[in-house]
Amino acid sequence: MKPTVWHHLRLCPHGHPDETIDDAAIAVDETGTIAWLGALSALPHGYAHWQREDLHGAWVTPGLVDCHTHLVYGGTRADEFAQRLAGVSYEEIARQGGGIVSTVRATRAADETTLFVQAAARLQPLLAEGVTAIEIKSGYGLDLASERKMLRVARQLGERFPVTVYTTFLGAHALPPEYAGRADEYIEEVCDRMLPTLADEGLVDAVDVFCERIGFSLAQTERVFEAATRRGLPVKLHAEQLSNAGGTALAARYRALSADHLEFLDEAGIEAMKAAGTVAVLLPGAYYFIRETQLPPIELLRKHGVPIALATDHNPGTSPLESLLLTLNMGCTLFRMTVPEVLQGVTRHAAAALGRADRHGALEVGRQADFAAWSVGSLAELAYWIGRPLCEQVVRGGTTVFRRMNG
């Protein structure tokens, strides 16, 4: 690529609307790295002959980060939607053999090509909203071959699309039918066979567990964390979504990257997260879709200074959401977060939730030039509009990978 100066833009380099530069410029060298950024009037003379790209006054933010998704799976769970509307709870559907296990059946039956095509269709709307990094979990295979298949598809998405994909092994997502009544044996399979094999194949960047009364116990979760730690892999946790099971405090003991959901999180868990540097990942899409009523403890998270990230939690059963911008709106309207909080929640804090704050979530000299240009008058509009296409252009590594067509 040619060295380029992107100019005539309003810059929000760290995802905070109170830290901006009007009439700014970003100089990107031939490697796709930011060489300089600041006010256009201060652009050094050495960049005068570089190629120019006019952004016509657009707001520019770091590329967005969707730090919690289940993007790869077979089928849908649209049939369960009517059950929910009739008052059947998520837990009851799961106990009847629906929920996660129904998606497991569809995922096991699908080949890699089918899973890739379906996941690609889910990914593309996110890319058109400025997402340049995304986490994708396994967890709908629940056997070695099927978990491998999911993680391979996630890696392929990162190779075929202009987005950085981080994979998370979520073998301990649910108990597969063939292990009914034998949860400890299944956890042994996860720890002793599945995780080591998939890690050795280079398919795992982090390890997650669903710690809930309809998922896995604290003791079982700790066994998975121990296995991940032995492999040198960071951990994260689905925690306190349906009850206060104490999973967050356990995750903090293992210095988890993040604890996610957190509707029933208590102050002791928050204090443990703060001490461990664990990010709180809130998932308003799931809260909305299954009509939860217990709000996550936003005020306590603020009080203790725990960084808060937001994510789509895209999945077929509780959050079939393909819009990180709608997630921002939900964070404000449902969780009563501020605009600065939600914007940092999908940039700087989301990157930290992946353990990649040094690579994503901010625009700084020496970093890869991943950014999004927005046709808005103020950054608050990113959380304000519902359904309006706001992203004009997405740049990844200094190359335009998306441009909205007008007319």
Curated annotation (Swiss-Prot):
Catalysed reactions listed for this entry: 4-imidazolone-5-propanoate + H2O = N-formimidoyl-L-glutamate
GO CC annotation terms, alphabetical: cytoplasm
GO function terms (MF aspect): imidazolonepropionase activity; iron ion binding; zinc ion binding
Cofactor: Zn(2+); Fe(3+)
Binding site for Zn(2+): H68, H70, H238, D313
Pathway terms, separated by semicolons: Amino-acid degradation; L-histidine degradation into L-glutamate; N-formimidoyl-L-glutamate from L-histidine: step 3/3
Coiled coil: none
GO BP of this protein: L-histidine catabolic process to glutamate and formamide; L-histidine catabolic process to glutamate and formate
Cofactor annotation comment: Binds 1 zinc or iron ion per subunit.
Pfam family membership, one: Amidohydro_1
Binding site for 4-imidazolone-5-propanoate: R77, Y140, H173, Q241, T318
CDD domains: Imidazolone-5PH
Residues where Fe(3+) binds: H68, H70, H238, D313
The enzyme's E.C. designation: 3.5.2.7
Keywords of the record: Cytoplasm, Histidine metabolism, Hydrolase, Iron, Metal-binding, Zinc
Annotated compartments: Cytoplasm
Residues that coordinate or bind N-formimidoyl-L-glutamate: Y140, N315, G317
Family listed: Belongs to the metallo-dependent hydrolases superfamily. HutI family.
Family matches, as HAMAP family: HutI
Record's function text: Catalyzes the hydrolytic cleavage of the carbon-nitrogen bond in imidazolone-5-propanoate to yield N-formimidoyl-L-glutamate. It is the third step in the universal histidine degradation pathway.
Identification of the protein by name: Imidazolonepropionase
Native organism: Burkholderia orbicola (strain MC0-3)
